[in-house]
């Protein structure tokens, strides 16, 4: 297993920011259509993270024109250009699957307040 660990370590990304369930992210994804390639931004909140190491994935959910859209990304995928954390969410669960059934104001995630800078 040590050989597999070294191969996996070579493929790990180092530019992944710290984020967890409830955080709002902008995921910049490279889309290749024929010979053209472009960057598409997928913005939504993180439902949860799964796995560990090279196999780690995270699921992002957004509501587009009244329809919920979820997309699962591998954290260390080469098609991800960059990941930006827009806001930190204040939630008490690691997986937010219950958010799929909520609508309107009930589906809002409270923003985490930072008390370390205030004196």
From Swiss-Prot:
Gene3D superfamilies named in the record: 2.30.30.790
Record's keyword annotation contains Ribosomal protein: yes
Keywords noted in UniProt: Ribonucleoprotein, Ribosomal protein
NCBIfam families: rplS_bact
UniProt organism field: Arthrobacter sp. (strain FB24)
Annotated GO biological process: translation
UniProt gene name: rplS
Protein's UniProt name: Large ribosomal subunit protein bL19
GO terms, molecular function: structural constituent of ribosome
Any single Gene Ontology cellular-component annotation: cytosolic large ribosomal subunit
Family listed: Belongs to the bacterial ribosomal protein bL19 family.
UniProt function note: This protein is located at the 30S-50S ribosomal subunit interface and may play a role in the structure and function of the aminoacyl-tRNA binding site.
Top-rank lineage group of the source organism: Bacteria
InterPro entries found in the cross-reference section: Ribosomal_bL19, Ribosomal_bL19_CS, Ribosomal_bL19_sf, Translation_prot_SH3-like_sf
PANTHER family given in the database record: LARGE RIBOSOMAL SUBUNIT PROTEIN BL19M, RIBOSOMAL PROTEIN L19
């Amino acid at each position: 297993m040590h050989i597999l660990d070294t191969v996996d370590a070579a493929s790990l990304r180092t530019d992944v920011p710290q984020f967890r369930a409830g955080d709002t992210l902008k995921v910049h994804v490279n889309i290749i259509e024929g010979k053209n390639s472009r960057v598409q931004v997928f913005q939504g909140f993180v439902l949860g993270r799964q796995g560990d190491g090279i196999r780690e994935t995270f699921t992002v959910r957004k509501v587009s024109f009244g329809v919920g859209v979820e997309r699962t990304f591998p954290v260390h995928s080469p098609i991800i250009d960059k990941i930006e954390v827009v806001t930190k969410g204040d939630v008490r669960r690691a997986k937010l699957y219950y958010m799929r059934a909520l609508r309107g104001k009930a589906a809002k995630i409270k923003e985490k307040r930072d008390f370390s800078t205030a004196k």
